[in-house]
Amino acid sequence: MRKIKDIRPIQLKDHKLYVINQLKLPKEKEWLELSTYQQVAEAIEKMIIRGAPLIGIVGAYGFAIGVKQILDEGRSLDDVRDVFDRLKNTRPTAVNLFWALERVWKKFERWTEEGRSGEELVNLLFKEAERIDLEDYHANKAIGGYGQVLLPERCNVLTHCNTGALATSGWGTALGVIRSAFENGKDITVYVDETRPYLQGSRLTAWELVEEGIPHYLITDNSAGFLMSKGIIDAIIVGADRITANGDVANKIGTYTLAVLAEAHGIPFYVAAPTSTFDLDTDSGKDIPIEERSQLEVKKCGGCDIAPEETEALNYSFDVTPASKITAIITEKGIISHVDKEHITKFLRYRGV
């Protein structure tokens, strides 16, 4: 069994959150201190930290930080709703953020009704955020364990965006499957989509793979289909920002394109995500709000203009892949091999989710 590094993107010290500034990678590994909920919200919005599971975890920590901040300032706990709303409104697509915030909000309501206050209340909220953090890490390890079984002993696997330790509490979802396969001695080569316009593949996934010593090639997004046509790609694994009741998946823009190409070439297309990514209150992908970010992210690269100033750009951050194009969804509870509403509902119910 190979030795794998344990990269962790966030640390909690003295009720302050320290995060790796992912905008500086791969050139510089800079840790930023976040000591107010406003700083946490800004870090999520600016994608200093990103990845659906991680923004949920950071949102939970941000809520605890916000409650402490309000109490330290001598304000009423009625103002805590402002903290919740500010964090909730940072990014609209990833459901993990809303799931984590709802969880800590319900605990906050219960504990205040029980008469918990002051330092005791703050400590309870930080412990709950730490619990969410730890649960995610264990979920990722389980996802990796289940998912690596799907990969042959020798496998060229293509992945999109960043779904590794930097997108989670550690280890990762889709990249966690690859980590687990490599750790277990499989001959894995990873083909990393650069993932325009934010380049999470080239900046973050490639950085993680270098850290781990996992063989990989960085590819342009528009070369994926050609590699499939040449028989180079054996499997595709991506993450998810939201999975609806019928199995449609919202993920980083470009995922749908890969799914269509995978189907055309007979290549298995896997989605790896914790069960907290399922949104059973949303029927299908057409109901998912899709974040549209600044056109400057498309028109600039590395601080340089790459398009005429007069040109307008579209910058949808996510797309939706229909359930019919997904081979299986890998979760910490096991693998959903029939991706439709009936099988998802039964799977989650039988496993106590």
UniProtKB/Swiss-Prot annotation:
Gene3D superfamilies attached to this UniProt entry: translation initiation factor eif-2b, domain 1, Translation initiation factor eif-2b, domain 2
Pathway the protein acts in: Amino-acid biosynthesis; L-methionine biosynthesis via salvage pathway; L-methionine from S-methyl-5-thio-alpha-D-ribose 1-phosphate: step 1/6
Pfam family, one: IF-2B
Active site: D241 (proton donor)
Gene Ontology BP terms: L-methionine salvage from methylthioadenosine
Sites where the protein binds substrate: R50, G51, A52, R91, Q200, N251, K252
GO-annotated molecular function: S-methyl-5-thioribose-1-phosphate isomerase activity
Catalytic reaction list: 5-(methylsulfanyl)-alpha-D-ribose 1-phosphate = 5-(methylsulfanyl)-D-ribulose 1-phosphate
Site (Transition state stabilizer): C161
Job description of the protein: Catalyzes the interconversion of methylthioribose-1-phosphate (MTR-1-P) into methylthioribulose-1-phosphate (MTRu-1-P).
NCBIfam families linked: eIF-2B_rel, PRK05720.1, salvage_mtnA
Family: Belongs to the eIF-2B alpha/beta/delta subunits family. MtnA subfamily.
Protein name: Methylthioribose-1-phosphate isomerase
Organism: Persephonella marina (strain DSM 14350 / EX-H1)
